[in-house]
Amino acid sequence: MLQTIFTYEWKQLLRSKGLIVALFIFTAIGFFCLKQGAIVYQYQRISVDSAMAKKIRSYDFVKNIFDTIKHSNIRSSIETPYILERRLQDVVAKNISPLSVLSIGQGDIYAPLISGHFNNEIFKNNFSEFKNPEQLLAGNLDASFFIVFLFPLLLLALTYNLQSADKELGIDSLLYTQAASVDVLFRQRLLFRWLIALLPMFFLTFLSFWLLYSLPGFSSLSFLQWWGVAFLYALFWLVVVALVHRLKFNSLVNAISLAGVWVLLLIAIPGLLNTWFNFQNPATNKTEIAEFRDYNAKIWDQSSENKRKHFFANYIQVLKGSANVDSNFIDIFSSALQILDKEKELHNVIANNANAQMKAEEKSFWINPVGGVVRSFAIIGNTGLEQQIQFEKAVMKYREEKLHYFFENILFQTNFTKKDFEKIPTYFEPNMELKFGKYLLPLSLLTLIAIFLSSIKIKNNNQ
């Protein structure tokens, strides 16, 4: 019976030239979205590779200097922290996952490169405050955008009149003469049209695998997880369509109802929630970042007495030998410490605000299940906000370690030797593999509830 229904629907599909054209158009749009993600990835990959190659060349150049340097009682310029850092041209790169091609997420908002110089504040690289993925609403033109926003429209266009059209054309009486019940026939026809709507997604799945599998860092498990989330989302919309059809509306009402559900789930609810969350957790004003830069200048202009007072509060062990320490180094170190502390304070305020908003959004996924899908895509693609926060915190920690290492060497040693150079702290990337299953729980539960409600309705009809 299923084969007969599929054959019938396939013949109907071939007769509908407009539907075939629509499938080709949606497939072309999907290809364009995938290409846009690939362009962003390629641009970032080239930027990172170029910057890291330059960093390696600079490191080798400075290393050669320390291989031949002759030390004396007076430090050479290369042995001073600022000159050494300027020569090293240190930069830290975030891991760019191949799956970011599918879900750009925060990838086009935040640069994947941050200066590793201990005195180059993070706000020089990124002026804007954090933004959450759900706040992007329509999002980026990538595969996740196509799946989240456009796939439902294609499915709704294929199925809105699936049941009502038979009655409107006067052929519904023929369906009652079939061996199978009308509900079974409806489910089989709906399944076929859902599979037709999935054709562009199948195309993107195979094409994306062909594009990504050879890229460095590609993970088959993560790839399957990403597309698993996509097909779970597609299943959710299948159940939504089935549930609306159980109400036995005519084609016009079905179209309006399904379009209303699309607007509600993808535009209205996320938009209202974001407005509320922004009110509850206002983003850090860019004026505060500008004021931090003014603070930077004020610290360098403060008196030497104030600088030394702050320094000795942190390094009391230096008091005994302070007469032997160059006061200029103390002033510079003190200023750098104060600026970094202020930068960490401001960055923590921004990060804590973002974390508070993300937790609030997580609770709202029960009424905004699409938000959970968007966040899952971003996490699997390593482009989520939480991963960006972890990256920037790791860079802050790295810069602080370097600051203390360079200046403590000046305080407690006569020279900065080759051995000291080889022990310069290195950056370690934090573990950014986050669990995303909890974000899909609302969508999964809502899908099961809709299936249950549809089953009850079908059972009552059969009775």
Pin down the residues of each PLM region.
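Transmembrane alpha-helical segments and their membrane-interface loop/helix boundaries
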Residues: 1-134, 262-463
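A structural motif at transmembrane helix-loop-helix junctions in multipass membrane proteins
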Residues: 15-16, 231-269
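Membrane-water interface at transmembrane helix exits
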Residues: 11, 160-164, 208, 212, ...
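Membrane-helix interface segments
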Residues: 17-18, 181-182, 219, 251-254
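Alpha-helical membrane-protein architecture signal
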Residues: 2-7, 183, 187, 220, ...
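Secretory targeting signals
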Residues: 25, 29-38, 134-153, 192-249, ...
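Long, hydrophobic alpha-helical segments
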Residues: 139-169, 447-450
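Helix-loop-helix units of permease transmembrane domains in multi-pass membrane transporters
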Residues: 14, 157-199, 461-462
